[in-house]
A protein has these predicted regions:
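P-loop NTPase motor module signature
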Residues: 1-325
Length: 325
């Protein structure tokens, strides 16, 4: 049995569906998945997609993971608590299970550090087919005079998204191109709902507005895979950063922020503040376009801001209260 972990339920479902489609087999037979409250696998399943939490739970009853001969840990760069615990567990398990094959995959992983951690494990680089992606910087801070005083008020993120969509439409007219789909990264559900309301009120012609976040029902999530004659604007959290590839995206609008779980020592509670993302996350977002044709990534912050950001996001284990773990 091949076990393949994903950090989110939405990704486990969509990857299982794609692998089953590639192999020409019904989902739930040779290829299945298991997430919380849902198990679409059986005794004949040979490839099992699951969240990393499900595999961790299985270690309670099967300490040596004897059901599996191969474990694939995907999106390892996210360094969530579950992923770090899983990687630590597998490292201690390998001397006891030398026959177990462990594959760690990621697009923006720190290769040397991970390889060294697993006793200089071999590194295999798989280059996907990508097209060139141009980067535009459109910071929210508007004009300043020579003394540094603002001539105009700063834009809100919603206003900047609308202005950027207008700029994209003008660019397409000048280049005589058909409307392309746009993926907009926002920090959370509330920001997505606010932006969706604003865009619907703007009554953009031949444009479909689609929200995308982890708590959406599977039926709602499937809407992003359906074609649309005009332009689709997908408003997504960082669930679309790595876990899900939205097809046909030509433009990415990156707000540069995400909700990042962090423990407050002062308040003694776990919080979800909106913070600036790392360079690795920004590059992941940029990579969402340029899959099927040349793309453009529009960042709603300056190039200086990007260059000053940390290379990687802090591992969750460094920003979480471990007392309850």
């Amino acid at each position: 049995l091949i076990g393949h972990t994903q950090p989110r339920r939405i990704a486990a479902r969509s990857v299982a569906s794609r692998v089953a489609e590639e192999l020409g087999t019904p989902l739930g037979a040779l290829v299945g998945y298991q997430v919380r409250f849902e198990d679409q696998s059986d005794a004949n399943t040979l490839i099992k997609l699951m969240t990393d939490g499900i595999l961790l739970a299985e270690t309670q009853n099967d300490r040596y993971l004897e059901r599996y001969d191969t474990i694939i840990v995907d999106e390892a760069h996210e360094r969530s608590l579950n992923i770090d615990f899983l990687l630590g567990y597998l490292k201690t398990l390998l001397p006891r299970r030398p026959d177990l094959k462990v594959i760690i995959t990621s697009a923006t992983i720190d290769l040397e550090r991970f390889s060294k951690h697993f006793d200089d494990a071999p590194i295999v680089e798989v280059s996907g087919r990508t097209f060139p992606v141009e980067t535009w910087y459109r910071p929210l801070i508007l004009e300043q005079d020579e003394e540094g005083n603002r001539v105009e008020d700063d834009l809100t993120v919603d206003q900047a998204i609308l202005a950027t969509l207008d700029e994209i439409a003008a660019y397409e007219r000048s280049e005589r191109r058909s409307p392309g789909d746009v993926l907009v990264f926002l920090p959370g559900e509330r920001e997505i709902r606010d932006a969706a309301d604003m865009l619907r009120k703007a009554q953009l012609k031949h444009t479909e507005i689609l929200p995308l976040y982890a708590r959406l029902s599977p039926a709602e999530q499937q809407r992003i895979f359906q074609s649309h004659p005009g332009r689709r604007v997908v408003l997504a959290t960082n669930v679309a950063e790595t876990s899900l590839t939205v097809p046909g995206i030509r433009y990415v609008i990156d707000s540069g922020t995400a909700r990042i779980s962090r423990y407050s020592y002062r308040a003694k509670v776990q919080r979800l503040p909106i913070e600036a993302i790392s360079q690795a996350s920004a590059n992941q977002r940029k990579g969402r376009c340029g899959r099927v044709e040349p793309g453009i990534c529009i960042r709603l912050y300056s190039e200086e801001d990007f260059n000053g950001r940390p290379a990687f996001t802090d591992p969750e284990i460094l920003r979480t209260n471990l007392a309850a773990v």
